[in-house]
Amino acid sequence: MLLLLSVTPGLAANNMASERLKGYNYGYIYGVGNTLCGLVIDKLVKKKYAKDLLSGTVKALSESPDHKPYISEIRNAYENITEDIVCKEVYQ
């Protein structure tokens, strides 16, 4: 029983770190997509460049073994930013 209690805080810390990394990966892709969207709207970069850079970033992260636990968050962020009311036109 004592051993189980001593392991529990470690498990909680691992779960918290995992949740933070999920949020980080979601925010990273959504943030990159949003930034590129704004640059296209402001006519600072071409649509094709933004689309290619965002999809390439998502592909690279999705293929990385280190990011395997976060593929769902990466894909959700990509879907959400490409369907965003403002950015939809940029990524279609």
Where are the model-predicted features located?
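Generic detection of intrinsically disordered/low-complexity segments and helix-coil linkers/edges
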Residues: 5, 18, 22-24, 64, ...
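Structured catalytic/translocation cores of nucleotide/phosphate-coupled proteins
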Residues: 12-15, 70-72
